Amino acid sequence: MAGQVILIVDDNARNRKLTRDVLEFSGFGTLEAAGGVEGVAMAQEHVPDLVLMDIRMPDLSGPEALKLLKEDSRTAEIPIVAHTSSTMRGDEERFLADGFDGYLQKPISVRELPDQVRGFLRA
């Protein structure tokens, strides 16, 4: 799995940096986008192996970005994982029903994130 590229879409620079550092230390390549609009454009241009998508972003929400990516033949097959700090009951079920391929709770677990990402890549 080494060398696979993960696109991190999050409007919070600290979250992006921590996620990037953990993934790169584990052998993944990374791309970063500071919002949904930039994330969609980067996914269309680079076609990463997996997208970690924040849900709440000011320019384009995670579910809105997901819809655009799933409608585009270049990006429709990329696994897209909801990556959120929301702790509302039923979130995971709602995100999966919306079409996300998985769900990760923030803050990330530095120990668990690489294995979680590998699991999404194998699914």
Regions found by a protein language model. Name each.
Residues 57:
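Receiver (REC) domain active-site loop signature in two-component systems and cognate sites
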Residues 46-52:
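Active-site beta3 strand of CheY-like receiver
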Residues 17-25:
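Charged docking surfaces used in two-component/phosphorelay signaling
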Residues 108-117:
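C-terminal output helix
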Residues 27-34, 42, 104:
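Short hydrophobic/Thr-rich beta-strand motif most characteristic of the beta2 strand and flanking loop
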